[in-house]
Amino acid sequence: MIKKLFIIILGLFIGIANAANNSLIIGDSHVGGIKWAVPNANVMYKNGSTVNYWLNVKPIHNIDNLYIMTGTNDYRHNIAPKSWYSNTQKLCKKWKPKHCYVVAPPRNSDWRYVKYREELMDKPNVRWTNTNDKTRDGTHFYRNTYKDFYYQIINNY
């Protein structure tokens, strides 16, 4: 009985460890900030990449958590917020993770980001992990606060 209980507990720990390691961060050179917040995740990055770049990459399936970070470069390439949002949904659908997260900018940053974030907050399938960012100046992402800027695309991607 004790041996069976030990095996069950060991199995739970292995399952939790595997789930933590079954996360993938994709994006540009800024992915290091997310890596700080999600230390067990694997990383794929290409400097200067946009969400459109990742749409053309062969997807990796069976991922529990997919974190997408391309917003800065999408803005540099003048991709409109609505297009960026719809492309992130396409990317989530193509890669089929259990949970899909995208890094979102703070509210009081560049005006394009403000407009973009406000548009996203109205989407029914977006859940913010933390919107209490009013005290941040928005000009710099501190590496230990990246986790505050995720939004999660849920269900209907």
Go through each PLM region and give its residues.
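Generic cytosolic/nucleocytoplasmic N-terminal low-complexity/intrinsically disordered segments
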Residues: 2-3, 17, 41, 64, ...
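Short coil/turn segments at secondary-structure boundaries
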Residues: 3-4, 79
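Sec-dependent N-terminal signal peptides
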Residues: 4-15
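Secondary-structure junction/capping motif
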Residues: 14, 29, 49-50, 119, ...
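Serine-esterase "nucleophile elbow" of acetyl-processing enzymes
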Residues: 18-65
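Alpha-helical cap/lid subdomain in secreted, periplasmic
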Residues: 55-157
